[in-house]
Amino acid sequence: MGRGRRALIDRRTIRKGLKVIAANDRDVAQALKRIGYPEPRIRPDGFEALLSIIVSQQISTGAAQSIMGRVRAILPEISAPATLALPDGALRKAGLSGRKVEYVTSLAQAIVVGQFDPVALEQQTDSQAIASICMLRGLGHWSAEVYLMFSLQRPDVFPAGDLALQRALQKLKGWDNRPNADESHAAVAHWMPWRTVGSLFLWHFYRGAPA
């Protein structure tokens, strides 16, 4: 699997990858003609990105953005040491649940004491980086995959457990039932080594496909 930071997955890269996928997948080729190309998703890496992923878990995008706005107001420098220096209750007042405060605090502590180094992820393979992130409290496989896709810009990641991707695959392929994670992985195996681009397209398709 991939290792290290790659070139950014920008508009040019998305077009290149989707042309390769479409040449080998008729359903993608037909849908691409209807809805066009997705936009890039490039996020910061490191502590701030992982904090944002924790904040966004199980809430709407709008709610997550509002909470992150309040977090930035109390943390002009979003870093692990600055987070640990916050007064008790500050993150709760910003809108994080008690459990998410525990996760963020645990993440910050792991970075400060040297148990976890986000920079080291750049030199790890995809599977190694995912395993490293999954060792942290509150960050599971999906969270790790999202970090690799958008923060490390890894080109061949497919979060098969993502419900929206599963529903998009079901609609794209005209299946009666939503595929599970294993079935989703198998369905896009021929998209390698462009599965991150394929994922972006499926999210785009999920929002824009006709009912």
Language model features with spans:
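Alpha-helix C-capping/helix-to-loop hinge sites
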Residues: 38, 53, 57-58, 74, ...
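Short helix-capping/linker segments at secondary-structure and domain boundaries
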Residues: 58-66, 112-116, 152-157, 205-211
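A general alpha-helix detector
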Residues: 49-54, 86-90, 128-132, 164, ...
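A positional/architectural concept
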Residues: 16, 22-53, 58-69, 73-76
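Short alpha-helical scaffolding segments that buttress acidic/His motifs in well-ordered protein cores
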Residues: 50-55, 104-108, 147, 198-202
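C-terminal accessory module of base-excision DNA glycosylases/AP lyases that mediates lesion recognition
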Residues: 1-38, 126-127, 141-211
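Alpha-helical ds-nucleic-acid-binding substructure associated with the helix-hairpin-helix region
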Residues: 8, 27-31, 59-60, 64-137, ...
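Structural motif
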Residues: 40-48, 95-99, 188-196
